[in-house]
């Protein structure tokens, strides 16, 4: 379980998060949705300690995020940033192997190497495992970074816009993989996603943010309602039921 208590954050005197509190249940997929500037990525970065807390507290699996040893935290949760940059030239396999560092300390075992290959295969990257990351397309690079996070093999996965640069096929495959990790391996997955229909079809819980506040939290069927989405996005979104899922139609 992830507990966020009265968390606030500001940049240059401008509030980005304003007294946010929530409980994210253990297990399953929780999607964070909302318009640009809502504070979604900032919330995820505070949960993962990529940024320091200014006010409030965060705990993950009972661990105080602000006080827990970095290596212990890295064995508990893995984070995919929205923007990822490399300062050295690495192959896909080398990059994914970094995900094992919290476990191996830089001395990978046979088990570590097997986990690397398994993660590469999960993201359909085996044919390009020996290619340099800077030779890949944007979507292939995104999958390589996600494979690195997957190789970390933590109970909690925090993913900031994991569908960036992915085409329709790989977006669906990514969400199916995350669903499988939650259902078969008991992972707790928290992701920022802009496509409300992916959130609706694959999530157990949705957090809706706006103007630095958490404005709604509930199941997809609770959140995917016209009045509620209008409150979040300030546009009218028609809701259709398709194969048991609520789908938002907002482009017509």
Where are these predicted regions, by residue range?
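The feature captures the beta-strand-to-loop junction immediately N-terminal to the Walker
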Residues: 33-35
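Conserved ABC transporter NBD signature motif
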Residues: 56-64, 73
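Conserved ABC ATPase signature
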Residues: 132-136, 140
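Helix-to-loop junction immediately C-terminal to a conserved catalytic motif
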Residues: 48
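Conserved ABC ATPase "signature" region
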Residues: 97, 110-128, 158
